[in-house]
Structures are given as C-alpha cells and as structure tokens.
C-alpha cells in the first residue's frame, strides 16, 4: 500500500508537526525512508516476527514512523493509552510479547521503568520527545535509535517485507476491558488495507490526485478509529496529516483547526458536544442582537436541513443569507471553513448535538463499528446519509440482525473483510464472538430500514431489565433529560434488577486547562440556567451542599416532563441525585474516547445507588 502511494504521492507533504512555533513538514518519500530506517533499527534491536512494538505517547510523526517501521520489520504495532497505569501497560506489553517500546516523554518512561524487570521479552526502549535524564542500558533517544540499523542492507529488509502475507497480524488494538481483562484484537494486513481503501471512499475521502485531504490528528492512536482514519487511510490516499498539540482535548484543538483549516474532521460525540457547549457559552455572553441573529440563522438552517427536499425559493434565499451573514463566520471561527466532511464515531450521537450542528449547516456523518471490525463497518457520507443513521455497510461487508423484537430491534452482526482475526491468547473469547456461520456478534442493538440504512438503538449489556422483567434502553431517557435540562452534563439511568428507575446526574462545569479534570465552577451556560431559575449559585458545591431549592425544583420539573413522554410508567425516573463532581477520564467514569463506563460508575457510586432502593 505504501509503495503504491509513494509512486503517486512521493513529493507531496505527508506529516506536519509544530516545532518552535513553526510547522515542520515531511513528504511521503521522506516518511517512507524514515519508516524503513526505523524498521532496520527494530531488526537490529532484535524485533522477532509477530512480536510487538508498543507505542506509548501522544500523536506525532514518531508514532507514525514507529508504527509503519514495526510492520515493515515483520512486527506488530500495539498502541498503549497514555492514561494507562503502569500495571495496565505491563498487562499489554506482557500479553503482546513487546520487544521494543517507543515512549514519548520522561513521565511515561517512568511508568515503563517501574515494570521493565517484569517484561521478559522487552529488549529496548526508545524515547522520542524528551532527552534522557539518566542513562540505562538499552535506552535510546529517537536520533540514536534511527542510526542503529544503518548496517542492515536494503535487501534484508525487502525480503522481510515481501515475505509477509495478507492474512497475518500487523496491528493489535486492546479493548478497554470494562468487564474483565483487556482483549487484544488482532488485525491483519488485509483488514487494514481493505478498510483504508474502502471505508474512506464510502465516506467520500478523496485521493490526493483529485484533492489532497488535510486532517488534524488528535484522538488516541491506540483506538482503532483514530489509527485507521489518521495513519493508514492517510497513507492510502496521500492525505496531509497535521498533529495537534498534546493538550488538544483541553482546549487547544480549535486553535490548530483554525490554523490548518482541514478538509475533513473526525470527532467522538463528546468532542462535538464540547464544541457545542463552548459555542453556547460564547452565545450566552454575547449581546441581545448577536444572540437573536444566531438564533434566527440556526433555526433557518436547521429547518432547511431537516426539510431539504421541500424548500421554496424564498426559504432558500433566507438560508443563503443566514449562512453568509452568520453561520459561515462561526464555521470559520471553528476552523471549518474548508471542511467538507465532518465524521462522528466510537459512540452514539445524541439528537441535540446532531441538530445543533445542522443549525450551523454542518452535517455530522456517523460511522459505526468496533475494534473487531477495524473501525468503521458502516459509514455515512455525502451520498449515503439519513439523519440518526450510521449509514450502510462499506463495500465487501454485510450486516444482519438476530433475535429481532416486535419493533425490529435486534443484535447487530458483522461479516466481511473488516472483521478481525480473533483475540490474542484468548481462543475461548474468540469463539464466543462468532456464531457457527462465521458472523461476528457486536453486542449492540439496532434496526435496518427498507433501504438498508442501519440505526444503532442501544447496547445489550446497557439494556436495563427491571425486577419486573421490563426491558428499558437507557440512552433515549438520558438524552431526553440532558435536552430538557441544559445544566446537566451527564445523566445515567439505574434500574437493572430494581423495582424502579433512578438517575445519577452531574452538572456542567469548567475544566481545568492543565489536567482536563472537572472543577467546581459552573460553565457560563450552567450559570445562565441558574439565573433564569432564580438561583445565584456559581459552583457545583453551592448547589449540592444546600440542595439549592430553585435548581432542584427545576431538575424535578425537567424530569417530570421527560416522564410525561415516557413509553410507559416503567420508563419513568422516580428518584435522582446530583453528584458533587462531573464524570472524567481521570475519575474513572469515562473511557479514553469519553465513553461512559457504566459498571465503573455503579461501583464508584454504590452508596448513592443503594440509597435509592433502601426500604
């Protein structure tokens, strides 16, 4: 795949990273040469066939070069989340027989130094951003490392590259392991090359000979969504990848987007929600006229996007005017002036976020898949779109539903070239994942419309089965509460094996710019809500400590409204509590892509949950 791209795109810029305030760029030819140098150095350090190179660090050219070099050398790429504890790093490195670790900085190196003596296969560690403070045997800087393989000839490396087969493993993606040990999903060369070629085209990503796409890389590369979108698809179609700053998710991402003006952008739902909240905060602080203009422009755009087939000439004129006067300026301020495709994946997108961006004339194309399907198995795009749907299966892939209920909801099952090889060292788990006909079971619930568009409706494990045997999908209830109450950040329904439903709530608060941890200070939008309700509170603790009457009454009224629209009484929230701190990655309630970890929340707030059901 890389050789084909090299012939077509060799002179084009491939990777761009900020050094001393300036963008440093390398071409595809330079990228390929550096990857070969890395491969030779991995061989020199003793990388064994089908053993892994584990990479622990934020997205960077060094991450990409190490990953490609590991594959060239016949090894397996294994990404490790920078938020992992030393023990979690040990589990992955031990399980994948890591021979070499590539580590970003001293802080992450310290984690590895704690576990190195318990990793029998680990031969060397490469540090790529910081200089080495204390010398150790087999510890190298990236500059030293890239020179190690200079005496290995091209023919030796070419023999290894040419001996590799499409059905051999080249990438390991470790699932989060919310219900047990993390599972290493083995992805083959064929999985990676097929997905890079066909999923991206289904989303209308262009080859560089038509238009060179530019993207910003910022989501963790140890997650398949970012790795396939940023790294492998980038090689396939000659994209220019700009690397965001490590604090991208703490607020600097928009600065990078404004500078780069990408042609395509992917975010997980929480990223799109954060952008939405930031804009709502900015709107809350603006003057009366600006507020009214934005509200008018967004309502005109939303109506046009929801009823695009039946707009009169006059409505089309108002839409164009709204876009010219207001919306285009907002998209420019977000860094989306040139962005033609906005993707969302890794978790379901709620209606409020979808409609908010349609109001800005930004369509969010949803992707759906899992680590075990090399990322997107179904994808929306400009020519393949329905609201609330994650599109259709990509070429070479199929979807079916099993055990459908009366409303057409069934478990989503996958078949095709994206489907993984199995779990490393877990034959029993691999057998459990597939049925006797070779279909991979997702554990997700969905329905298909008459045209084959897939709609994900929930997760079987998340489905609440009450003490009375009633099935309750929690996400629609949670989304309804968040829509009704703009002060609420996270809402989680409780009720499995219980007599009634209850709910844990957190409030929207400002994040610490250095750590991304939630602070006690309410966001502008939340303070705005408090003022409207007659409360002077500016912090979460003020509201929780005093059970602020105005806010608690407003929350109860909001929940009453949601209950009024419930399918039946079983779907009604009977008790709730406001937690003193919002959910976060560091708090353990959210995963690396900001997905809610329901079991972890239940465990952490066991006392609060138990209090709902005490007789």
Across the structure, where does each feature detected by a protein language model lie?
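Conserved AMP-binding A3 loop
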Residues: 25-29, 170-197
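Conserved AMP-binding/adenylation subdomain of ANL enzymes
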Residues: 193-214, 221-329, 338
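Conserved ATP-binding/catalytic segment of the ANL
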Residues: 400-402, 406-466
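Conserved pre-ATP/AMP-binding loop-to-beta segment of ANL
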Residues: 10-13, 147-174, 181, 206-214
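AMP-dependent adenylate-forming
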Residues: 2-26, 133, 577-583
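Conserved AMP-binding/adenylate-forming core of the ANL superfamily
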Residues: 11-68, 85-90, 141-149, 189
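Conserved C-terminal "lid"/linker of ANL adenylate-forming enzymes
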Residues: 490-492, 556-615
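ANL superfamily adenylate-forming
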Residues: 20, 107-166, 279-329
């Amino acid at each position: 795949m890389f050789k084909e791209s090299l012939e077509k795109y060799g002179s084009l810029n491939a990777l761009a990273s900020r050094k001393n305030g300036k963008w440093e760029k390398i071409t595809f030819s330079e990228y390929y040469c550096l990857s070969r140098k890395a491969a030779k150095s991995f061989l020199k350090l003793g990388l064994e066939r089908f053993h892994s190179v584990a990479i622990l660090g934020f997205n960077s050219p060094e991450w990409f070069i190490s990953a490609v070099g590991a594959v060239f050398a016949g090894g397996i790429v294994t990404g490790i989340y920078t938020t992992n504890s030393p023990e979690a790093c040990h589990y992955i490195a031990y399980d994948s027989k890591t021979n070499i670790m590539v580590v970003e900085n001293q802080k992450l190196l310290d984690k590895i130094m704690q576990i190195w003596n318990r990793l029998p296969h680990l031969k060397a560690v490469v540090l790529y951003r910081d200089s080495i403070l204390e010398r150790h045997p087999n510890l190298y800087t990236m500059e030293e490392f890239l020179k190690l393989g200079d005496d290995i000839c091209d023919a030796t490396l070419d023999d290894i590259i040419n001996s590799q087969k499409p059905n051999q493993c080249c990438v390991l993606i470790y699932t989060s392991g919310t219900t047990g040990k993390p599972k290493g999903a083995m992805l083959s060369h064929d999985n990676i090359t097929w997905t890079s070629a066909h999923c991206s085209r289904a989303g209308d990503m262009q080859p560089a000979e038509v238009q060179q796409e530019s993207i910003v890389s910022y989501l963790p590369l140890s997650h398949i969504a970012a790795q396939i979108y940023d790294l492998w698809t980038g090689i396939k179609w000659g994209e220019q990848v700009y690397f965001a700053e490590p604090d991208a998710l703490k607020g600097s991402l928009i600065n990078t987007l404004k500078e780069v003006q990408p042609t395509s952008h992917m975010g997980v739902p929480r990223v799109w929600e954060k952008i939405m909240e930031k804009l709502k905060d900015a709107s809350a602080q603006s003057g009366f006229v600006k507020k009214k203009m934005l509200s008018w422009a967004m309502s005109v755009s939303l109506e046009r996007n929801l009823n695009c087939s039946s707009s009169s000439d006059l409505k089309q004129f108002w839409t164009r005017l709204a876009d010219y006067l207001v919306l285009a300026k907002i998209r420019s301020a977000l860094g989306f002036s040139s962005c033609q495709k906005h993707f969302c994946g890794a978790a379901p997108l709620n209606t409020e976020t979808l409609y908010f961006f349609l109001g800005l004339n930004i369509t969010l194309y949803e992707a759906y898949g899992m680590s075990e399907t090399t990322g997107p198995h179904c994808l929306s795009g400009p020519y393949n779109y329905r609201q609330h749907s994650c599109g259709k299966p990509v070429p070479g892939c199929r979807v079916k539903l099993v055990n459908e209920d009366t409303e057409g909801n069934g478990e989503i099952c996958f078949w095709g070239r994206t489907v993984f090889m199995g779990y490393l060292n877990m034959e029993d788990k691999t057998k459990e994942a597939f049925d006797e006909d070779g279909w991979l079971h997702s554990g997700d619930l969905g329905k298909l419309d008459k045209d084959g568009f897939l709609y994900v409706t929930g997760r079987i494990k998340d489905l609440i089965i009450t003490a009375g045997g009633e099935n309750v999908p929690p996400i629609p209830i949670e989304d309804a509460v968040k829509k009704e109450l703009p002060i609420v950040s996270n809402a989680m329904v409780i009720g499995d094996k219980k007599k009634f439903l209850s709910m844990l709530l957190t409030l929207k608060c400002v994040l610490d710019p250095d750590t991304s941890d939630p602070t006690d200070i309410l966001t502008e939008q939340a303070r705005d809500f408090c003022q409207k309700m007659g409360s002077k509170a500016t912090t979460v603790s003020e509201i929780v400590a005093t059970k602020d009457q105005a806010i608690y009454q407003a929350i109860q009224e909001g929940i009453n409204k949601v209950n009024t629209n419930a399918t039946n009484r079983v779907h009604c929230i009977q008790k709730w509590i406001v937690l003193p701190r919002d959910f976060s990655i560091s708090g353990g309630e959210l995963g690396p892509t900001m997905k809610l970890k329901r079991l972890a929340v239940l465990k952490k707030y066991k006392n609060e949950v138990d209090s709902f059901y005490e007789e």
